[in-house]
Amino acid sequence: MEYTSSPKPQLSSRANAFSIAALMSSGKTKDKESEENTIKPLEQFVEKSSCHPNLGDLPPLETHSDFSSGGGTGSGAPLCTEPLIPTTPGVPSEEMAKISCSLETKELWDKFHELGTEMIITKSGRRMFPTIRVSFSGVDPDAKYIVLMDIVPVDNKRYRYAYHRSSWLVAGKADPPLPARLYVHPDSPFTGEQLLKQMVSFEKVKLTNNELDQHGHIILNSMHKYQPRVHIIKKKDHTASLLNLKSEEFRTFVFTETVFTAVTAYQNQLITRLKIDSNPFAKGFRDSSRLTDIERESVESLIHKHSYARSPIRTYAGDEETLGEEGHSAHSRGSAFTASDNLSLSSWVTTTSGFSGFQHPQSLSAIGTSTASLASPLPHPIQGSLPPYSRLGMPLTPSALASSMQATGPTFPSFHMPRYHHYFQQGPYAAIQGLRHSSTVMTPFV
């Protein structure tokens, strides 16, 4: 008996849309679209000038009644900031149109811009380097001006640094917006005469990623690109303080070479090197190989003098003048635990540790003559017969001094010699601390 399959019932268009085949096919098309929208931008290179045209896409500047507050009502702008500078007609007044602004240290900014400037942001706030310094011209000498700065995002994208390509790539959309803030220069208001004579430096501006910051620092998102802007506002005489900016005249200046990426740690090693070489406050990060010959000699001489001054055994005051030439000075600055004739004190202690008294007058006289510069400034008739430890700065007891003057030859004070071997193993500082005591009973280190 043969079984025949019954014909499948025909489904309506609505029912067919919810079938397994239709759902799977629609899921594949959605996956393809999402891959095209998310994966491809990650592989696109970010051109150095690609961020500048987006500056024209900034929304119109919104008015803000409170000058000191950090934010305002949302304007629905796609960017992560809400500009706080009030809106005025596009064409500035004749007086404000005459004002021009130039960026100081432009050459340094250009060097960083070629590599892709990065600025560190921290919870406590970090200052910018290079610092934004500007100078104004065309201002009225008798008028008063307020200089401000804010930092706005370049676009609504988030970036990541590709180390294998040494370039920045788009990593997706920007993070949620942070409170926008204006930084008023602390010396404001300036007179026009002051602005003509001096430059305005925003060296105290600090960048932070702390959303709850209460110190007035500019809050930024990490791995986002930003553009600093400088604003100059003409202050009217009848206004005591800037509480309402609706009636104030202002002008904004943007320098494209100051665009930077906010980071919590430097991504590009070339940026790190350039900042170390250019920042005068980063001298601690430089090694001696980057110094000039003159600087290196001065640094080495300072280190040499410092180590010599800290030496526990050195010549007495006034004896340095009698040393004479460089050979004597170099010998006096040498290690106090190395004698002449290639005889080290450690080997000398080892060879004489088995005797209760010193029985080698020839070696002792050689040591005495070589270390004469390390003794007291006044010559002594029994200089060559004194025990070696007296010439190293150890005070002698009367009994030891008397025994050294006997015809039988010099002897050591009444302590056991092998114990001092432990002192010299501890280094010069620990050794002198043990030798400095005037007691004849010496105990070894535990």
UniProtKB/Swiss-Prot annotation:
Pfam family, one: T-box
Protein location: Nucleus
Region Disordered: start-end pairs: 50-80
GO molecular function: DNA-binding transcription factor activity, RNA polymerase II-specific; RNA polymerase II cis-regulatory region sequence-specific DNA binding
Subcellular location, principal: nucleus
UniProtKB keywords: Developmental protein, DNA-binding, Nucleus, Transcription, Transcription regulation
CDD domains named among the record's database cross-references: T-box_TBX20-like
Gene Ontology BP terms: angiogenesis; blood vessel development; cardiac muscle cell proliferation; cell fate specification; cloaca development; embryonic heart tube development; embryonic hemopoiesis; heart development
Stretch forming the signal peptide: none
DNA-binding region in chain numbering: 108-287
GO CC terms of this entry: chromatin; nucleus
Function: Transcriptional regulator that may play a very early role in the differentiation of the cardiac precursors.
Official protein name in the record: T-box transcription factor TBX20
Lineage: Eukaryota, Metazoa, Chordata, Craniata, Vertebrata
